[in-house]
Amino acid sequence: MYPVMLNLQGKKVLFIGGGLETASKVQKLLEQGAWVRLVSPLYHPELAQALHQGLLEWQQRSYTYGDLAGFTLCFSHPVDPSLNSIIAQEARERGVWLNAVDDPAHCDFILPSVHRQGDLVLAVSTSGVAPALAVRIRERLAAEYGPEYAEYLELLRSFRPLVKEAYPHSFEARKAAWYRMIDSEALDLVFLGERERARAVLLQSLYSPTSPSPDGHAAPWQEVV
């Protein structure tokens, strides 16, 4: 299995539903900005708002051959799981990537157990062998990586243009700057609620203590009080 993060913003996704987890799985796709066509004989009230907002198209019926036309990504969670073999056959014929819920034999990809804190995404997979173990590991990670990491990443995001501006011609210099920043005490300060002090430490770490700024002037960290 090759791990990957997909940008689903604005992408068309087909979800063949009706199974017990249909609503929750469709909702997660919508949260990532996908436009979803749901083919399901059942009404899922949890998705009513998305239907009203036009984020979701619902066709109240069971799967029929040809439904995958025009899509590159499909999720299958039908009322009758035996349909997965037929859906997988069409997916192969059309070159569509398929995830069949709880049916790894018919999957082109599987979904990890995920913990999110803002821009931090921790994904755990057992390659389909024991998803329950992945859930337990995710729960342990969730206890360690709390909301402070979301705040920390929000702060680091604001430094991206500063790093590019400071070292516009050297990938290695940018890389070194990022590691200096990450290895600083900034995260500890975020945990203490000292965000402005954390910002000052990151700004100081942007340049090595022995190097001038690229424009020859004093590095910004030298001006921080």
Tell where the protein language model's regions lie, with residue ranges.
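Hydrophobic, well-ordered beta-alpha structural blocks that scaffold small-molecule cofactor pockets
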Residues: 1-42, 47-50
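Hydrophobic beta-strand scaffold residues
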Residues: 36, 58, 97-98
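An accessory alpha-helical subdomain
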Residues: 128-225
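Short loop/edge segments at beta-strand edges and connector loops
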Residues: 40, 58-62, 102
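Glycine-rich, highly charged phosphate/nucleotide-binding loops
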Residues: 49-69
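Residue-level detector of alpha-helix initiation sites
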Residues: 19-21, 81-82, 128
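E1/E1-like adenylate-forming module used to activate ubiquitin-like modifiers
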Residues: 100-150
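ADP-ribose/adenylate-binding Rossmann-like module
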Residues: 73-79, 84-111
